[in-house]
Amino acid sequence: MLKEDNRFTAVELFAGAGGIALGLEKVGFNTILLNEIDKDCVQTLRNNRPEWNVVQKDIKELDFTGIEADVVTGGFPCQSFSHAGKRLGFEDIRGTLFFQFARAVKEIQP
């Protein structure tokens, strides 16, 4: 949905250093919320883009209902499935975070 400034909106989950939001910004999107749990990544985000709404919290603790966004993006951890790792899949807590991403999409309904 276009907002007052006629820009599409996005939410970025597992934001890391905000690479997806930066790319979307270049094509005119307004990222209205970035979620990241890692304190160093959050500090980087806040230092580089103080105007961004960065939420440092475990995604499992966030309620996304009521958030209006056109796009939900995110780079959820893949170590649990990577050939370079132990490939523990859903037995590794990181392997279950995809389901939190899916929950966010369901609650936001972009």
Where are these regions (language model features)?
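Conserved active-site and SAM-binding loop architecture
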Residues: M1-P110
